[in-house]
């Protein structure tokens, strides 16, 4: 998917992942481990499929199924754009240390949850600000299609949200930090997230809520007619507060709260900034 650099992760991070990893195409199937003569993990296997382990990072991106191939070039172009922006020093799409809303998200998670959490679309930062803000209460594992060139400070697997490569009922919680609308198929990703969470496991979705205006309605109508097109140059999908809630409920989650994250405005009606929300739910 990208040129892999010499940067990976410590061997102990990989070893900590092995008990949780599964076939991305069928996550009820655990992966078998292939080691070299020195005992180093070099590949993970499921049936006839073999997935590389590169510099202690399991590379678990499957071949996309036929139905997803039409959107693949657009998806690849978007991923390449974000990756290049990061390499050029623009961390705008990532929750870096100076991201106040990201820090608030981490604090909310720390107050309401604990245990082992999955960051779905963790990006390429060594440690996103919400991870730092929730440390002590939450232990993080990250998954992202980007291999990256940064040594992450948490266990990491290269993978897709639609094909989360983890066994069922492993995680106490999961977070989509501004990533749900980047997926080719967010519905599929949410269903897989439901699978990897323990019963009553927490789900946090941080995203920009769209207003029910002309642009959104036109885009939604085109989607309904079968025209696969992005909402804008950065987002494959768009959600209002209500439509996101509907998608979560259809995936088997019960929504507990939707927290308005703008620190400058008292409510959505008076806000002219990005309308960012943190939706809090749990697996039913």
What are these regions (language model features)?
Residues 162-174:
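A short acidic, Gly/Pro-enriched loop at the edge of an enzyme's catalytic core
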Residues 187-199:
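A short glycine-rich, Lys/Arg-flanked "PGG" loop and its adjoining helix->strand segment in the class I
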Residues 226-243:
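Acceptor-substrate binding/catalytic loop of class I
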């Amino acid at each position: 998917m990208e040129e892999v650099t010499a940067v990976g992760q410590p061997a102990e991070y990989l070893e900590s992942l092995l008990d949780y990893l599964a076939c991305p195409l069928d996550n009820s199937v655990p992966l078998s481990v292939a080691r070299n003569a020195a005992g180093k993990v070099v590949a993970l296997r499921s049936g006839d499929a073999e997935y590389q382990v590169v510099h202690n990072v399991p590379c678990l991106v499957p071949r996309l199924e036929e139905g997803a191939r039409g959107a693949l070039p657009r998806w690849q172009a978007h991923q390449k754009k974000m990756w290049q922006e990061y390499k050029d020093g623009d961390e705008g799409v990532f929750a870096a240390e100076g991201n106040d809303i990201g820090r608030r998200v981490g604090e909310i998670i720390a107050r309401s949850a604990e245990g082992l959490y999955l960051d779905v679309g963790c990006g390429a930062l060594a440690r996103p600000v919400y991870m730092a803000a929730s440390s002590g209460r939450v232990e993080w594992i990250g998954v992202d299609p980007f291999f990256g060139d940064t040594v992450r400070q948490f266990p990491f697997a290269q993978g897709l949200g639609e094909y989360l490569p983890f066994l069922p009922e492993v995680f106490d919680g999961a977070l989509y930090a501004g990533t749900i609308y980047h997926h080719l198929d967010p519905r599929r990703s949410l269903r897989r997230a439901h699978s990897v969470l323990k019963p009553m496991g927490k789900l946090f979705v941080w995203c920009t809520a769209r207003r029910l205006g002309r642009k959104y309605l036109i885009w939604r109508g085109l989607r309904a007619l079968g025209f696969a097109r992005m909402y804008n140059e950065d987002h494959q999908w768009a959600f209002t507060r209500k439509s996101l809630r509907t998608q979560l409920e259809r995936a088997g989650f019960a929504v507990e709260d939707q927290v308005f994250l703008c620190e400058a405005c008292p409510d959505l009606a008076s806000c002219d900034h990005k309308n960012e929300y943190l939706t809090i739910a749990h697996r039913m």
